[in-house]
UniProtKB/Swiss-Prot annotation:
Lineage of producing organism: Eukaryota, Metazoa, Chordata, Craniata, Vertebrata
Cross-link (Glycyl lysine isopeptide (Lys-Gly) (interchain with G-Cter in SUMO1)): 488
Residue(s) of cross-link: Glycyl lysine isopeptide (Lys-Gly) (interchain with G-Cter in SUMO2): 327, 469, 488
Name recorded for this polypeptide: Nuclear factor related to kappa-B-binding protein
Biased composition (Low complexity): 216-232, 677-688, 695-715, 723-733, 892-902, 1019-1043
A Gene Ontology molecular function term of the record: protease binding
Organism: Homo sapiens
Length: 1299
C-alpha cells in the first residue's frame, strides 16, 4: 500500500472549493489497519463510487507498479496466471456475479452503511472475539456431555453384557431430551401466563395489561378444551364462492399466532398511524364477536349476533318448505361425510335450478357433524359436550347448536328425544339446573357449569365423561320436575323457576328513610331483638315483612356474655345481634322480597345497632360478604338472579308460625347433636352446673355433703379458690358429725389480746416428682418449745378422691387443756447443719401478725403442717409432710369452744397492700430426679429449686388444651422449665452434703426447711451463712435470705418408696385489726418445709393427729432476739369407710391433739407450697395464684423425670374470677384473653375494663384505712392505703350424695 499512499492522502481536485465556493465533508475509514479519509459523497453515492472505482481508472490512472502491487491480492492460478487475472479483473469491474455477489458492489454497500468506520470496526472485532469464545465454550460443553454419555453408555453395555449372554440383543436406552435454560424459561413463562389467565377468568377481568401485549404473552388454548382432530374440508359446490371463506374452519397453532403477532408489531413500528393498525376504538364485544364467529365455522359468522335468533327461525321455516325436494340429496351427502375419509367429489355438474337448494340445505344438515356426538346418554351430556368443544359459549350459540342437532336425522335415535318438542327452549333451564341454581337439585349436588357475568358466557367445570351415570340420573330427575317448575315460571313474573311468590305486593321503592320512619323502625327492631327466639313481622311503608328467629338462639334466657367486637356495630348491643342477622332482616324488608345490594345497604343503615361513624363503603363491603354467606347456608334465605341482577329473599312466603316451627326443629336437632357429641361421665364423678365445685360449711350438727368435679378417679381433686371460712371442695362423701379432740398445752402464749381475723390462704397442690429411694442415717429429734397459736383442724376422708385438710390459725381462740392420755407427735427441732442463703429483692417492712389458713390434700400417711407465728426477726410459715408412725393414741371425747362451725360467709378476701405494706410472692418450682441406690447416701441428681421473683412465666396458648372429659389441661413442658431458668431467678441446689451424715437408709426420713428472713443479714452476723456454698459473696441491705436446713425424721422401715414434691402455691395476707402487744421491730417471716416421706405406707392399727404449738427463738441479727410462734400439725390417714371430722380449738398455750382411727387406706400425700415474703416494691396488683391440682404421672422404672400436668375446671366466662385469673403487674399493651382458656395476666386497668364490661361483677377495688392494717405497731397511722379486694361468692348448694 506504500505505492498508493499518495493517492489516498493527496486531496482530490474537485474544483475551486478552497476558494470558499464549496466545502469538503470527509469521513474516516479503517481499511486493513490503515486509516484513510474519503469524501462522504464517494461513500454514499453509488454512481460516484463506480465512476471512481472502474476499469478506466485501473487502466489509465494507475501505473504499472501500482497494478502489480494490487494484483498480488488476486487469486493465483497455476497456468496462465496473468491472463486469468486479467479476465478476473474485467469480470470484477463489469459487475458479474461471483456466486455470492460482486465484491465491488458488496464493498460499496459496506462503505455506505458505515461498516468501515473505525468505531464500528473496533466493536465488530470485539463481537467476533466474544462469539468465538462462546463457540469454544459450547464445544467444550458438547464434548463434556459426549464424554459422560460415552462413559455411561459403556458402563451400561458392560453391565448388560455381564448380566446376559452374547446371544441376547442389546436394548439401547434413548436419552431423554435435556431441558435447556431457554426451554425452562419458556415453559415458566407459559405456566405463569396460564395461571394469570385463570385468575383473570375467575375474577372476571378482561382488561389487558402491558406485559400481556408482548410477543411472549400469547396464551395457549384452554386446558378444558380437548384437542380435537383436524376437521376435513367440507365439500361445497364450486359456484358457491361466497361461503368458502367461512365454511372452512381454520386451525391456527401457537406458532402461527406468534408469527401473526410479530408481523403486527413490525407493521406498527413502521407505520404507527396506519388506520388498519389502530386498535384503540375496538371493544371487547367486537373481539368476542370475531372470535366466536370464526370458532363456530358456520354461515352464522356472516351475520350479526343481535339478529342470530331471527335468522335461525328463518332457516327453520325454509327447511320445512324445501325438505321434500332436498331430502335425498342430504342423505347422500350425510353418509359419506360421516366417515373419516371425506366425501368423494361430485361427478355431475348441478343444474342452475338446483344450485340454491344444493348450496344451502346440505350445509344446514351437515352442521351437527362438526364435533358433536349426535347420540348421547342424556340432554345434559349433549350440552356438556358442546361446552367441552367450545370451551366457553353464550346462550344464543348453545341454542343454535342444539337446534342444529335437533334438525339432524340422527338426533331422533336418542331414547329421550321425544320427551320435549323443542330442546332449544330447554337449554337455559338445563344450564341453570347444571349450575346448581335450581331448588330441585339434590343436597349433595356439585355444579357442572358456571355462568360468567362479565362475558355473559357459560363455562364447563371439570370433565363430563367421568360423570355419565350421574348426569343420566340427574337428567331423569330434571325431566320429572321441569314441568312444574316451568308452570310456576309462567305464572310468576320472574325468570327464576324456584323463586316463591311474595306474600304482599307493593309498589314501594327503597329510598333513604326519614327521621320518623327510622324511629318507627328502630322501635320495632328493638322489640324484635328483645325476643330473638321468636319470629317477628316488620310493618313499614304499607306492607309487612316476616323475619325468622335469630339463628342459634333457642330460648329467651340469652347468654350474658358481651357481644363480640365489630368495627361496624355498637359494642353495647346484645350478643346475638350480628351483621349476618341484620343483613337477613334487611333482605326480608325488601319490597316484594327482591332488590339490589344497594337497596339492602340502604335498609341496613336504618338499624340502631350500626356504629354512628360507619361509611357507605364499609356498609357495602360488609353486606357483600354477608349476602355471600347467606347465599351458601344450608337453608339459604337469599338468592341472586343473574338475569335481572337482583337479590331475592327466598323466605318471603313463610309465615311466623312456619318460621318458629322450623326453628324449633333446628333447636331439637342441635340438642340431639350436642348430646351425641358429649361422652357419658363415669358414675363416680359429679360435675357442678356452674363449673365450680360447690363448697359447704362444716358444722357440729347434722352431717353435710360436699362435691367436686374429678378429672380421674385416681387423681387428686381440683381445689377451687378457698372461701373463708368454709372448707375447700371435697368429694361427695357423707361426713360424720365432728368429734371433739383434746388440745395439749405446751407453752405460754405471747399474744395477750385477740386480733381481728383476716385469713390468708395456703393453696397446696401436688405436682409430679420422682421417688427419693432409701432413707438416711438416724438422727435424734428434738421437740421445740412453742407458744400457742390456736388452730382449728377439719379433716375428711373419702374413697372417690383425696381428702382435704384445712388448718386455720387464729390467736383469738381460747386455750383448752388436753384431754387425751396418749403421746403426741410434734414437729422436732431442726438440728444445726449446712444452710444455703439466697438473697431476694425485699426490704424491711412493718407487717402485722398474720392469720394463716392451709389446705392440704391427705392420702395414706401422716402429714404435718406447722404454722409459725411472727416474731421480731422472722415470719414463719412451715408446711411439713412427715412419714406416718404407729402411736397408740386414744380418741378424745371432750368438747372445746373450737368445735363450733365456722360462719356461713362465702367471701374470700385476698388483700394486697400498697404503700408501706406490699406482699410479694416468690414461687418455688422445679423437679427432683432421683435414682435409688444402695448405700448410705442419697444421690439427688436434678434437685434444683428455682425461686422466682416478680416475673411470671407466660404460657403459650398451645399449652392450654381440653381433654376428652371437658376439663382444661395446662401442660408444663421442659421447655417452659428452661424458660424459667433463663429468667432472673436464683437457684437453690439441695446436694448430698446438705442432708447430713450417712447411716442406715431403711428407717429415716428427710426434710428440708427454707427460712425466709426479712431483716438485713451481714456476712459476720450468722455462723450458718459461712457454710452456704451457693450464697452470694455480699448480701445487700434489706434483702430476704432463704435458709435451707436439713432435718431427719424417723419413718417406718417398711416404707421404701417416697416422693418429694416441690413448692407450688402458698399465699399469706396481712391481718387487719389492732393489737396491743407488738413492737415496731416485729417482722413476719415465711418458712417452707419440704419433707421426704410421702410414700406408700402400710396399714397401721391407729394413726395420730398432733397439733402442737411451741415457742422457738428466732435469729434476729439487727433487732435482737425475739420469740417465734410455731404450730405443728400432724395429719393422719383415715379409713375410707369411717368418715371423721375434727374441729380443734387451742388456746394461748401449746396444746397437742391426738385422734385415733381405724385401718387406714394406702394412699399418697402430695404437698406443695409457695413462699410469700414482704417487700416495699410499690407495684399493684400482686399475683393471686389459682389453686389447681397437679396430677402425678405414672412412674416409668425407678428413675422418673416427668413434666407435671395441671388440670382444673376453668369456667367458660369470667364469673369464677378467683379460679382462673392471675393478677400481676404487667407492662402496657398486654391483651386480655377470655373464653374457654384461663386469663393469664390482668393489670389494674384491665380489671377496671372487666368491671365496665360486666364480666367481673364480683371484683371491686376498695380503699382500706391504714389503721386496719397496722395491727402490731406501737403508733398507728391514719394514712389510707389502696387495697385490691377480689371476692368470689358462689352461692353454697347442697351437694347430692354420691352413690
Amino acid at each position: 500500500m506504500d505505492s498508493l499512499d499518495h493517492m489516498l492522502t493527496d486531496p482530490l481536485e474537485l474544483g475551486p472549493c478552497g476558494d470558499g465556493h464549496g466545502t469538503r465533508i470527509m469521513e474516516d475509514c479503517l481499511l486493513g489497519g490503515t486509516r484513510v479519509s474519503l469524501p462522504e459523497d464517494l461513500l454514499e453515492d453509488p454512481e460516484i463510487f463506480f465512476d471512481v472505482v472502474s476499469l478506466s481508472t485501473w487502466q489509465e490512472v494507475l501505473s504499472d507498479s501500482q497494478r502489480e502491487h494490487l494484483q498480488q491480492f488476486l487469486p493465483q492460478f497455476p497456468e496462465d496466471s496473468a491472463e486469468q487475472q486479467n479476465e478476473l479483473i474485467l469480470a470484477l469491474f463489469s459487475g458479474e456475479n461471483f456466486r455470492f455477489g460482486n465484491p465491488l458492489h458488496i464493498a460499496q454497500k459496506l462503505f455506505r452503511d458505515g461498516h468501515f468506520n473505525p468505531e464500528v470496526v473496533k466493536y465488530r472485532q470485539l463481537c467476533f472475539k466474544s462469539q468465538y469464545k462462546r463457540y469454544l465454550n459450547s464445544q467444550q460443553q458438547y464434548f463434556h456431555r459426549l464424554l459422560k454419555q460415552i462413559l455411561a453408555s459403556r458402563s451400561d453395555l458392560l453391565e448388560m453384557a455381564r448380566r446376559s449372554g452374547p446371544a441376547l440383543p442389546f436394548r439401547q436406552k434413548r436419552p431423554s431430551p435435556s431441558r435447556t435454560p431457554e426451554e425452562r424459561e419458556w415453559r415458566t413463562q407459559q405456566r405463569y401466563l396460564k395461571v394469570l389467565r385463570e385468575v383473570k377468568e375467575e375474577c372476571g377481568d378482561t382488561a389487558l395489561s402491558s406485559d400481556e401485549e408482548d410477543l411472549s404473552s400469547w396464551l395457549p388454548s384452554s386446558p378444558a378444551r380437548s384437542p380435537s382432530p383436524a376437521v376435513p374440508l367440507r365439500v361445497v359446490p364450486t359456484l358457491s364462492t361466497t361461503d368458502m371463506k367461512t365454511a372452512d374452519k381454520v386451525e391456527l397453532g401457537d406458532s402461527d399466532l406468534k408469527i401473526m403477532l410479530k408481523k403486527h408489531h413490525e407493521k406498527r413500528k413502521h407505520q404507527p398511524d396506519h388506520p388498519d393498525l389502530l386498535t384503540g376504538d375496538l371493544t371487547l364485544n367486537d373481539i368476542m364477536t370475531r372470535v366466536n364467529a370464526g370458532r363456530k365455522g358456520s354461515l352464522a359468522a356472516l351475520y350479526d349476533l343481535a339478529v342470530l335468533k331471527k335468522k335461525v327461525k328463518e332457516k327453520e321455516e325454509k327447511k320445512k318448505k324445501k325438505i321434500k325436494t332436498i331430502k335425498s340429496e342430504a342423505e347422500d351427502l350425510a353418509e359419506p361425510l360421516s366417515s373419516t375419509e371425506g366425501v368423494a367429489p361430485l361427478s355431475q355438474a348441478p343444474s342452475p335450478l338446483a344450485i340454491p337448494a344444493i348450496k344451502e340445505e346440505p350445509l344446514e344438515d351437515l352442521k351437527p357433524c362438526l364435533g358433536i356426538n349426535e347420540i348421547s346418554s342424556s340432554f345434559f351430556s349433549l350440552l356438556l359436550e358442546i361446552l367441552l368443544l367450545e370451551s366457553q359459549a353464550s346462550l344464543p350459540m348453545l341454542e343454535e347448536r342444539v337446534l342444529d342437532w335437533q334438525s339432524s336425522p340422527a338426533s331422533s335415535l336418542n331414547s329421550w328425544f321425544s320427551a320435549a318438542p323443542n330442546w332449544a327452549e330447554l337449554v337455559l333451564p338445563a344450564l341453570q339446573y347444571l349450575a346448581g341454581e335450581s331448588r330441585a337439585v339434590p343436597s349433595s349436588f356439585s355444579p357442572f357449569v358456571e355462568f360468567k357475568e362479565k362475558t355473559q358466557q357459560w363455562k364447563l367445570l371439570g370433565q363430563s365423561q367421568d360423570n355419565e351415570k350421574e348426569l343420566a340420573a340427574l337428567f331423569q330427575l330434571w325431566l320429572e320436575t321441569k314441568d312444574q317448575a316451568f308452570c310456576k315460571q309462567e305464572n310468576e313474573d320472574s325468570s327464576d323457576a324456584t323463586t316463591p311468590v311474595p306474600r304482599v305486593r307493593t309498589d314501594y321503592v327503597v329510598r333513604p328513610s326519614t327521621g320518623e320512619e327510622k324511629r318507627v323502625f328502630q322501635e320495632q327492631e328493638r322489640y324484635r331483638y328483645s325476643q330473638p327466639h321468636k319470629a317477628f313481622t316488620f310493618r313499614m311503608h304499607g306492607f309487612e315483612s316476616v323475619v325468622g328467629p335469630v339463628k342459634g338462639v333457642f330460648d329467651k334466657e340469652t347468654s350474658l356474655n358481651k357481644a363480640r367486637e365489630h368495627s361496624l356495630l355498637r359494642s353495647d348491643r346484645p350478643a346475638y345481634v350480628t351483621i349476618l342477622s341484620l343483613v337477613r332482616d334487611a333482605a326480608a324488608r325488601l319490597p316484594n322480597g327482591e332488590g339490589t345490594r344497594a337497596e339492602i345497604c340502604e335498609l341496613l343503615k336504618d338499624s340502631q345497632f350500626l356504629a354512628p361513624d360507619v361509611t357507605s363503603t364499609q356498609v357495602n363491603t360488609v353486606v357483600s360478604g354477608a349476602l355471600d354467606r347467606l347465599h351458601y347456608e344450608k337453608d339459604p334465605c337469599v338468592k341472586y338472579d343473574i338475569g335481572r341482577k337482583l337479590w331475592i329473599y327466598l323466605h318471603r312466603d313463610r309465615s311466623e308460625e312456619e318460621f318458629e316451627r322450623i326453628h324449633q326443629a333446628q333447636a331439637a336437632a342441635a340438642k340431639a347433636r350436642k348430646a351425641l357429641q358429649q361422652k357419658p361421665k363415669p358414675p363416680s364423678k359429679v360435675k357442678s352446673s356452674s363449673k365450680e365445685s360447690s363448697i359447704k360449711v362444716l358444722s357440729s350438727g347434722p352431717s353435710e355433703q360436699s362435691q367436686m368435679s374429678l378429672s380421674d378417679s385416681s387423681m387428686p381433686p381440683t381445689p377451687v379458690t378457698p372461701v373463708t371460712p368454709t372448707t375447700p371442695a371435697l368429694p361427695a362423701i357423707p361426713i360424720s358429725p365432728p368429734p371433739v379432740s383434746a388440745v395439749n398445752k405446751s407453752g405460754p402464749s405471747t399474744v395477750s389480746e385477740p386480733a381481728k381475723s383476716s385469713s390468708g390462704v395456703l393453696l397446696v397442690s401436688s405436682p409430679t416428682m420422682p421417688h427419693l429411694g432409701t432413707m438416711l442415717s438416724p438422727a435424734s429429734s428434738q421437740t421445740a418449745p412453742s407458744s400457742q397459736a390456736a388452730a382449728r383442724v377439719v379433716s375428711h376422708s373419702g374413697s372417690a378422691g383425696l381428702s382435704q385438710v384445712r388448718v386455720v390459725a387464729q390467736p383469738s381462740l381460747p386455750a383448752v387443756p388436753q384431754q387425751s392420755g396418749g403421746p403426741a407427735q410434734t414437729l422436732p427441732q431442726m438440728p444445726a447443719g449446712p444452710q444455703i442463703r439466697v438473697p431476694a429483692t425485699a426490704t424491711q417492712t412493718k407487717v402485722v401478725p398474720q392469720t394463716v389458713m392451709a389446705t392440704v390434700p391427705v392420702k395414706a400417711q401422716t402429714t404435718a403442717a406447722t404454722v409459725q407465728r411472727p416474731g421480731p426477726g422472722q415470719t414463719g410459715l412451715t408446711v411439713t409432710s412427715l412419714p406416718a408412725t404407729a402411736s397408740p393414741v386414744s380418741k378424745p371425747a371432750t368438747s372445746s369452744p373450737g368445735t363450733s362451725a365456722p360462719s356461713a360467709s362465702t367471701a374470700a378476701v385476698i388483700q394486697n397492700v400498697t404503700g408501706q405494706n406490699i406482699i410479694k410472692q416468690v414461687a418455688i418450682t422445679g423437679q427432683l430426679g432421683v435414682k435409688p441406690q444402695t448405700g448410705n447416701s442419697i444421690p439427688l441428681t436434678a434437685t434444683n429449686f428455682r425461686i422466682q421473683g416478680k416475673d411470671v412465666l407466660r404460657l403459650p396458648p398451645s399449652s392450654i388444651t381440653t381433654d376428652a372429659k371437658g376439663q382444661t389441661v395446662l401442660r408444663i413442658t421442659p421447655d417452659m422449665m428452661a424458660t424459667l431458668a433463663k429468667s432472673q431467678v436464683t437457684t437453690v441446689k439441695l446436694t448430698q452434703d446438705l442432708f447430713g451424715t450417712g447411716g442406715n437408709t431403711t428407717g429415716k426420713g428427710i426434710s428440708a426447711t427454707l427460712h425466709v428472713t426479712s431483716n438485713p443479714v451481714h456476712a459476720a452476723d450468722s455462723p450458718a451463712k459461712a457454710s452456704s456454698a451457693s450464697a452470694p459473696s455480699s448480701t445487700p441491705t434489706g434483702t430476704t435470705v432463704v435458709k435451707v436446713t436439713p432435718d431427719l425424721k424417723p419413718t417406718e422401715a417398711s416404707s421404701s418408696a417416697f416422693r418429694l414434691m416441690p413448692a407450688l402455691g402458698v399465699s399469706v395476707a396481712d391481718q387487719k385489726g389492732k393489737s396491743t402487744v407488738a413492737s415496731s421491730e416485729a417482722k413476719p417471716a415465711a418458712t417452707i418445709r419440704i419433707v421426704q416421706g410421702l410414700g406408700v405406707m402400710p396399714p397401721k392399727a391407729g394413726q395420730t393427729i398432733t397439733v402442737a404449738t411451741h415457742a422457738k427463738q428466732g435469729a434476729s441479727v439487727a433487732s435482737g432476739s425475739g420469740t417465734v410462734h410455731t404450730s405443728a400439725v400432724s395429719l393422719p390417714s383415715m379409713n375410707a369407710a369411717v368418715s371423721k371430722t375434727v374441729a380443734v380449738a387451742s388456746g394461748a398455750a401449746s396444746t397437742p391433739i391426738s385422734i385415733s382411727t381405724g385401718a387406714p387406706t394406702v394412699r399418697q400425700v402430695p404437698v406443695s407450697t409457695t413462699v410469700v415474703s414482704t417487700s416495699q416494691a410499690g407495684k399493684l396488683p400482686t399475683r393471686i395464684t389459682v389453686p389447681l391440682s397437679v396430677i402425678s404421672q405414672p412412674m416409668k422404672g425407678k428413675s422418673v423425670v416427668t413434666a407435671p400436668i395441671i388440670k382444673g375446671n376453668l369456667g367458660a366466662n369470667l364469673s369464677g374470677l378467683g379460679r382462673n385469673i392471675i393478677l400481676t403487674t404487667m407492662p402496657a399493651g398486654t391483651k386480655l384473653i377470655a373464653g374457654n382458656k384461663p386469663v393469664s395476666f390482668l393489670t389494674a386497668q384491665q380489671l377496671q375494663q372487666l368491671q365496665q364490661q360486666g364480666q367481673a361483677t364480683q371484683v371491686r377495688i376498695q380503699t382500706v384505712p391504714a389503721s386496719h392494717l397496722q395491727q402490731g405497731t406501737a403508733s398507728g397511722s391514719s394514712k389510707a392505703v389502696s387495697t385490691v379486694v377480689v371476692t368470689t361468692a358462689p352461692s353454697p348448694k347442697q351437694a347430692p350424695e354420691q352413690q
